């Protein structure tokens, strides 16, 4: 899962949206640096990452990547799940339009920015103003996201080519998304994530 899915599942679970978004920028035990609700959100994010990576649908999808891109498949798939969530938002969350949800999420996350790591603050400078969460529905934007990550981290250069794996398996990936994401939503609503 990437930014949008983590925020969405956190909302369904009444968990800290701030903690769920911040989690990738925090190493080790967050309890000494953040309030309890944010800490709980960080831990929820970590549990979701482990759970998602071990879902049969996701493990199957990783196998569809070519040898040269399989190493980055988990990252590429996380971004792709956000694509499907953004694309199908009106079906998934008919009572909370995406633009309104993004505004709500932004307001929640903004409260922790003064005490956040600089890299997280930098992400937030772009995430909201450039409307990344809404733009995830556009596959051209997904390609830009993958290229941007590859530019920032040369070790992940294979992300550029992983675009072709997404394109080649788009329909099958979308089908897998519909298999597992509604289950995760139900688990979030039961506070079982």
Swiss-Prot record:
Primary role: Converts holo-ACP to apo-ACP by hydrolytic cleavage of the phosphopantetheine prosthetic group from ACP.
Catalytic activity: holo-[ACP] + H2O = apo-[ACP] + (R)-4'-phosphopantetheine + H(+)
Family per similarity comment: Belongs to the AcpH family.
Name of the protein: Acyl carrier protein phosphodiesterase
GO biological process, one term: fatty acid biosynthetic process
Entry EC no(s): 3.1.4.14
Keywords: Fatty acid biosynthesis, Fatty acid metabolism, Hydrolase, Lipid biosynthesis, Lipid metabolism
InterPro entries hit by this protein: ACP_PD, ACP_phosphodiesterase_gpbac
Lineage top rank: taxon: Bacteria
NCBIfam families: PRK10045.1
Annotated GO MF terms: [acyl-carrier-protein] phosphodiesterase activity
HAMAP family: AcpH (MF_01950)
Major enzyme class: hydrolase
């Amino acid at each position: 899962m990437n930014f949008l899915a983590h925020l969405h599942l956190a909302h369904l679970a009444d968990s800290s949206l701030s903690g769920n978004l911040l989690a990738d920028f925090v190493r080790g035990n967050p309890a000494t640096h953040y309030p309890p609700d944010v800490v709980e959100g960080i831990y929820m994010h970590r549990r979701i990452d482990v759970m998602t990576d071990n879902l049969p649908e996701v493990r199957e999808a990783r196998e569809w990547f070519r040898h040269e891109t399989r190493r980055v498949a988990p990252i590429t798939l996380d971004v792709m799940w956000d694509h499907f969530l953004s694309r199908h938002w009106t079906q998934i969350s008919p009572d909370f339009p995406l633009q309104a949800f993004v505004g709500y999420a932004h307001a929640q996350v903004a409260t922790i920015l003064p005490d956040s790591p600089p890299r997280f603050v930098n992400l937030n400078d772009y995430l909201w103003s450039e409307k990344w969460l809404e733009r995830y529905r556009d596959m051209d934007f997904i390609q830009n996201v993958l290229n941007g990550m590859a530019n920032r981290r040369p070790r992940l250069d294979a992300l550029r080519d992983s675009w072709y794996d997404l394109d080649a398996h788009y329909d099958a990936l979308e089908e897998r998304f519909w298999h597992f994401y509604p289950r995760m939503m139900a688990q979030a609503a039961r506070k079982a994530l």
